[in-house]
């Protein structure tokens, strides 16, 4: 891999793109350390210590710790993720949006523009909610209207800037910019999470108990990583045969090919969407100071918090786990239906003289692809749930409250593999052997 990286940096275009990505990520990390004027940067550090909700841990992981530091990038790209979820869901209800989605490059540009506007709106809403909810509670000393405007402006502008940086990375760098920013934010939390695990389970224990705890932690992490790699690498290849035909005096066709269908067809999207939807109500209600107490609202918020899903003393809150699993499965099917259309694939195969051995072209081919795809989606969604739930289990039973869990590993591994594929494709154009063949 080091040799391949060396070869990649020998290619001017790839080298320029990689340096651009690194430069933008440095800007992101510097921005995450710049405090908002007039804000007590220690407020959320102390507040986090008194909270049992994991929704803010999840949120803070996505911001790379910027939220607890109350930097200008405190909201990070979470408004963009939420707006993407909203737009994707609205494509079901509004045919205009659905047509845009299927209208090629022009339609995607329009949807991207709409997503930007929704992102700014959500950033403004979250900024105002945070300022109102915590401003008079110590977040903003000597709170007044002008200070509130400054905080709201900084938070909204920071989120908009990250959205712009993500789009620039996608266009001028390698990989998906938003995903890369999300990955670097998550990775930046790994050292502190490992330190938390060490202090909680190893430090102060006897040598035998400490070694056993460390071994279990490493084993769990390795198992989750292996499961993630298997999920991302699993592919079902559907064989395709092309019939021979005469073109002038030449016989064309007769070649064999295949349709690669990934086991994890939707990637990390179902996990991000499901986790964001589960966390969003908790975050908003907490920001505006409505935690629900012991009423119905309080019980609902507890059910939405993964810390309570495996709590032996309160098993009723495991209903939240059921909702989470259903959301992951739903988004897996939903997102795959957007990115892969069996009817279009079957029609294109028929037009090109292709067929699946043993399956008639047209409608039977479409039904066959739908059947295989449905099976793969379910397996992929089940795998995603297992990987995501393992850390929830240890969190609920043993109190291992860290932000770097199964969801984070899925995101990091998925983004790294996808970025490497893009680097590989750019290198193959110039006849360089790359990562994936090694």
Where are these regions (language model features)?
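N-terminal cationic and glycine-rich segments that engage phosphates or anionic surfaces
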Residues: 1-101, 105-438
């Amino acid at each position: 891999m080091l040799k391949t990286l060396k070869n990649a940096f020998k290619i001017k275009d790839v080298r320029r793109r990689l340096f651009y990505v690194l430069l933008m990520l440095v800007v992101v990390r510097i921005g995450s350390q710049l405090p908002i004027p007039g804000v007590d940067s220690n407020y959320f550090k102390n507040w986090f210590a008194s909270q049992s909700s994991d929704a803010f841990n999840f949120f803070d992981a996505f911001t790379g710790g910027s939220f607890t530091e109350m930097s200008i990038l405190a909201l990070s790209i979470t408004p963009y993720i939420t707006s993407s979820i909203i737009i994707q869901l609205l494509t079901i209800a509004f045919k205009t949006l659905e047509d845009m989605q299927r209208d090629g490059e022009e339609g995607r540009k329009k949807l991207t523009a709409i997503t930007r506007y929704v992102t700014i709106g959500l950033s403004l809403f979250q900024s105002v909610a945070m300022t109102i909810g915590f401003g008079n509670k110590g977040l903003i000393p000597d709170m007044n209207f002008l200070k509130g405007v400054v905080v709201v402006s900084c938070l909204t502008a920071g989120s908009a800037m990250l959205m712009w940086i993500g789009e620039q990375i996608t266009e001028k760098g390698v990989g998906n910019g938003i995903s890369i920013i999300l990955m670097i934010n998550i990775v930046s939390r790994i050292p502190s999470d490992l330190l938390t695990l060490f202090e909680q389970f190893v430090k102060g224990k006897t040598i035998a108990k400490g070694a056993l705890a460390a071994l279990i932690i490493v084993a769990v992490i390795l198992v989750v990583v292996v499961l993630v790699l298997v999920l991302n690498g699993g592919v079902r290849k559907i064989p395709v045969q092309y019939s021979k035909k005469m073109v002038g005096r030449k016989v064309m066709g007769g070649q064999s090919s295949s349709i690669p269908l990934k086991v994890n067809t939707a990637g990390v999207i179902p996990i991000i969407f499901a986790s964001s939807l589960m966390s969003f109500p908790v975050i908003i209600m907490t920001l505006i100071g409505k935690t629900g107490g012991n009423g119905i609202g309080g019980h609902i918020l507890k059910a939405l918090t993964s810390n309570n899903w495996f709590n032996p003393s309160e098993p009723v809150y495991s209903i939240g786990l059921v909702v989470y699993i259903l959301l992951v499965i739903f988004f897996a099917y939903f997102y795959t239906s957007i990115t892969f259309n069996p009817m279009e694939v079957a029609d294109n195969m028929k037009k090109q003289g292709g067929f699946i051995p043993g399956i008639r072209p047209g409608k039977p081919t479409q039904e066959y692809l739908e059947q295989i795809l449905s099976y793969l989606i379910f397996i992929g969604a089940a795998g995603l749930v297992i990987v995501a739930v393992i850390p929830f289990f240890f969190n609920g039973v043993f109190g291992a409250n860290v932000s770097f869990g199964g969801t984070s590993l899925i995101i990091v591994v998925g983004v790294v593999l996808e970025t490497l594929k893009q680097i590989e494709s750019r290198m193959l154009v110039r006849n360089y052997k790359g990562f994936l063949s090694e």
